[in-house]
C-alpha cells in the first residue's frame, strides 16, 4: 500500500519553491488561449487537492467544487443553496444593484488557468481562478480598472452559499447533517463552513483579505451563506483587486489555515507572481505539435487528465486515480485499471514522466489486489464486480511503457513481486482448448457470453511480450522465455480461432470481436476496438486480414458503422455514436488519420475537454460522458504520438 509521506514530500517541496519559481519565470508571459464558449459551457481548473469543475462561462460563478476523501471512498462536493452556485462574484457600481459578471470574454493561461474580462461603462473587470500546486486551496481574483474621466466608487464582492454536501462516487448523493457558517478560527477576515454529524466531518473556508462579510443563517435564509465585499474609489486610470481564497479542511481550523497559507503566499509575492508560478508549472507539462489548434486540444487534455484523473485525498494525503473528478461525468470518482493505465497513463507519460512513476505506484500498490475487477473504489475495494481481461493486463502494459521511456530499473526491481502477481492472474485465465484467455466482461463493461475477446487477447499478447522485456531486465531468463512462448502461442490462437469466414458483405475473412472457439460475434467494442490491433503491434496496418476488418467496420454491412455520416466512425450497441477512443485510434492509423483529425477538430467537445463521444451528424458531444478525464489522456496521447515535436 502506498503511504502519503513519500509523495507528500514532492508536493511540499513544490509548494516551497513556488516563490523562487515565480521569480525565475517572471520575464516569461504566460501563453494565453482565447476561448469561444456557449452560455451553458463551464470551465474546469484545480490542483491535486481541490477541483473546481464547473466555472460557469455565463457569469464566472462556481457551481460546485470538490476534494477527494479516502474515508468517503470518493469526492466530497459542497453545493450552493436551492440551485445557486457555491460562489458568485459580482460588481456593484456606486449605490446601484449588485450585478453578476454576465458579459465575460474568456481565455486560459497556459491552457489551465481561467481568466475572463468584461468591459462595462468605462470599467474593465477581470476575473481569474487559480489553484496553485501544493496548496489545499485556490483563489479567485477580481480586478477593476477605471477608464472613465471621473472617479468611480465600486464594490467587488463574492457571495458564498452552503446548501448541501454530496458524496460522489459515480453520482452525487446528498449527505444528511448540519451545515453552519462562522468566522474562520484564528484567521481574519474569513468564513468557515462546517458539515457536522456527531462532530465536524468536513469544512471549507473563504478567506478574503481587505473585504468584509455579512453572514446569514437559517431560518432567515435557506442555507448558511456569506457576502464578502470591498468598496474602493478609483481615480481615472487607477485599478484595484480583491482576492478570495477558497480552501478545504478536515475541520474548521485546518480549512481556515489552509486558506491562510495561500493568503500569505499571495501577500508575500503578489497575485501576479503566484499566477505566473502556477502557469510555469503547467507550461512544464505541456508539449507542442507546432500547430496552435492541436496544441490547444492536446495540452488542455494533458493537464485535465493529470489533475482530474488523479488527485490527493484530503484525509490520508494519498495519490489516487479516478475516472474523473468532475461530477459532469456519469461514473465519476471511481477507479478502472483500463481508464487509469491504458487511457490516462499514456498522456501522463507524455507530459510528466516523474508523475507517471507516482501513478504506477498507486496502481501497483493499493489497487493491485483487485486488478482486473470491473471497477473499484479509490481504496481498492471492489465497487462493481466482474473480471475484465484487458483491465487485468493494463498495469503490465503501462509499466513496460514507463520502463522503456525512463530506463528506471530500480522502480521495476521494487515492483518485482507485483509483476509476478499480474502474470499469475493472467495465466489463470488461460484456456487450453482454444489457447486463448477468458474474460467475463468486455471493454465497454458489458457481459459477453462468448468468453474469448479478440482485442483483449491481442492486449494480453502485448502484455506477454512486455513481460518478456521486463523479465529480461530483472535477469529472470526462464520467466522471460515463458512469457515469449505464451505470446507466440496466443498470437497463433487468435488468428486460428477469432477469424470469421462468412461475415455478411465482407470481402473475405475478418476478425470477430468475441468467440468461444466455434461461434463468433461480428461487432466492434470501441473502448477495446479491433482498430487498435496495429497500434498494439499485433497486426500490420496493411495486413489483408486487418484491411478487410477495417473496411467491413466502416461499411453499411456493420449496423453501427455510421459510414454515411459526416463525423461517423464505428460504434456499438452500447456506444451508438462516434466515440473519443475511435477518433484517437483512427488518428494513429495512416489510412484514417486525416479524417480522424478533421473530426477531432470539428467538435467543440465539452468546451474543449474530451467527452465519451460525439453525434455522428453534428459532432455535438454527448452529455453523460462530459469531462471524461481518463479518455482526455488517451486522445491527448494520440495527438502527441502522431504530431508532437521532441522535447528541447
For the regions a protein language model found, what residue spans apply to each?
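Acidic/polar, glycine-enriched structural segments that form the non-catalytic walls/loops
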Residues: 25-33, 124, 130-333, 648
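Long, well-ordered core segments of solenoidal/helical folds
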Residues: 301-314, 351-375, 415-435, 485-506, ...
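Aromatic-rich carbohydrate-recognition surfaces in CAZymes
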Residues: 240, 331-432, 454-457, 626-646
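The feature captures the catalytic groove of carbohydrate-active enzymes
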Residues: 240-241, 245-263, 329-330, 375, ...
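Beta-strand-rich N-terminal accessory domains
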Residues: 25-88, 113
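Extended ligand-binding clefts on enzyme/binding-domain cores
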Residues: 333-337, 431-432, 450-459, 473-474, ...
Amino acid at each position: 500500500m502506498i503511504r502519503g509521506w513519500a509523495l507528500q514530500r514532492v508536493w511540499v517541496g513544490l509548494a516551497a519553491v513556488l516563490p523562487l519559481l515565480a521569480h525565475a519565470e517572471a520575464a516569461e508571459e504566460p501563453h494565453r488561449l482565447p476561448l469561444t464558449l456557449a452560455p451553458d459551457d463551464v470551465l474546469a481548473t484545480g490542483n491535486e487537492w481541490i477541483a473546481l469543475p464547473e466555472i460557469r462561462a455565463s457569469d464566472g460563478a462556481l457551481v460546485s467544487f470538490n476534494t477527494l476523501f479516502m474515508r468517503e471512498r470518493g469526492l466530497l462536493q459542497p453545493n450552493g443553496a436551492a440551485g445557486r452556485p457555491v460562489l458568485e462574484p459580482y460588481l456593484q457600481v456606486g449605490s446601484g444593484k449588485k450585478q453578476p459578471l454576465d458579459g465575460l470574454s474568456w481565455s486560459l493561461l497556459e491552457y489551465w488557468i481561467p481568466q475572463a474580462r468584461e468591459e462595462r461603462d468605462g470599467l474593465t473587470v477581470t476575473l481569474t481562478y487559480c489553484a496553485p500546486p501544493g496548496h489545499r486551496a485556490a483563489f479567485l481574483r477580481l480586478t477593476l480598472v477605471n477608464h472613465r474621466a471621473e472617479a468611480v466608487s465600486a464594490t467587488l464582492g463574492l457571495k458564498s452559499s452552503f446548501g448541501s454536501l454530496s458524496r460522489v462516487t459515480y453520482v452525487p448523493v446528498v449527505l444528511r447533517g448540519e451545515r453552519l457558517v462562522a468566522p474562520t478560527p484564528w484567521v481574519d477576515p474569513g468564513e468557515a463552513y462546517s458539515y457536522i454529524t456527531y462532530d465536524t466531518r468536513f469544512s471549507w473556508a473563504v478567506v478574503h483579505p481587505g473585504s468584509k462579510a455579512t453572514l446569514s443563517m437559517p431560518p432567515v435564509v435557506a442555507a448558511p451563506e456569506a457576502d464578502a465585499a470591498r468598496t474602493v474609489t478609483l481615480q481615472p486610470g487607477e485599478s484595484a483587486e480583491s482576492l478570495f481564497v477558497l480552501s478545504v479542511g478536515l475541520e474548521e481550523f485546518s480549512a481556515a489555515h489552509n486558506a491562510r497559507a495561500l493568503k500569505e503566499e499571495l501577500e508575500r509575492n503578489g497575485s501576479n507572481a503566484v499566477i505566473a508560478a502556477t502557469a510555469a508549472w503547467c507550461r512544464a507539462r505541456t508539449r507542442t505539435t507546432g500547430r496552435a489548434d492541436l496544441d490547444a486540444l492536446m495540452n488542455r487534455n494533458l493537464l485535465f487528465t493529470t489533475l482530474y484523473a488523479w488527485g490527493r485525498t484530503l484525509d490520508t494525503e494519498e495519490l489516487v486515480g479516478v475516472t474523473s473528478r468532475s461530477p459532469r461525468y456519469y461514473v465519476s470518482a471511481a477507479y478502472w485499471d483500463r481508464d487509469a493505465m491504458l487511457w490516462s497513463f499514456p498522456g501522463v507519460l507524455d507530459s510528466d514522466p516523474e508523475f507517471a512513476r507516482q501513478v504506477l505506484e498507486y496502481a501497483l500498490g493499493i489497487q493491485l489486489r483487485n486488478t482486473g475487477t470491473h471497477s473499484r473504489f479509490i481504496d481498492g475495494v471492489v465497487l462493481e464486480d466482474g473480471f475484465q481481461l484487458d483491465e487485468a493486463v493494463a498495469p503490465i502494459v503501462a509499466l513496460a511503457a514507463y520502463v522503456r521511456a525512463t530506463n528506471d530499473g530500480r522502480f521495476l526491481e521494487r515492483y518485482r513481486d507485483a509483476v509476478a502477481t499480474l502474470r499469475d492472474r493472467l495465466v489463470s485465465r488461460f484456456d487450453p482448448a482454444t489457447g486463448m484467455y477468458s474474460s467475463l466482461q468486455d471493454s465497454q463493461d458489458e457481459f459477453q457470453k462468448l468468453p474469448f475477446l479478440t482485442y483483449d487477447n491481442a492486449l494480453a499478447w502485448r502484455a506477454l511480450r512486455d513481460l518478456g522485456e521486463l523479465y529480461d531486465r530483472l535477469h529472470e531468463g526462464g520467466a522471460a522465455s515463458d512469457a515469449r512462448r505464451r505470446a507466440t502461442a496466443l498470437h497463433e490462437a487468435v488468428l486460428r480461432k477469432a477469424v470469421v469466414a462468412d461475415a455478411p458483405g465482407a470481402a473475405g475473412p475478418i476478425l470477430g470481436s468475441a468467440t468461444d472457439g466455434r461461434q463468433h460475434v461480428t461487432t466492434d467494442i470501441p473502448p477495446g476496438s479491433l482498430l487498435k490491433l496495429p497500434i498494439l503491434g499485433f497486426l500490420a496496418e496493411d495486413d489483408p486480414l486487418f484491411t478487410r476488418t477495417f473496411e467491413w467496420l466502416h461499411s453499411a454491412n456493420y449496423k453501427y458503422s455510421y459510414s454515411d455520416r459526416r463525423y461517423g466512425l464505428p460504434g456499438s450497441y452500447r456506444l451508438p455514436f462516434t466515440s473519443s477512443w475511435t477518433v484517437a485510434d483512427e488518428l494513429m492509423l495512416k489510412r484514417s488519420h486525416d479524417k480522424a483529425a478533421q473530426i477531432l477538430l470539428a467538435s467543440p467537445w465539452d468546451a474543449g475537454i474530451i467527452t465519451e463521444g460525439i453525434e455522428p451528424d453534428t459532432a455535438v458531444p454527448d452529455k453523460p460522458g462530459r469531462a471524461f478525464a481518463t479518455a482526455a489522456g488517451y486522445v491527448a496521447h494520440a495527438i502527441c504520438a502522431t504530431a508532437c515535436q521532441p522535447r528541447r
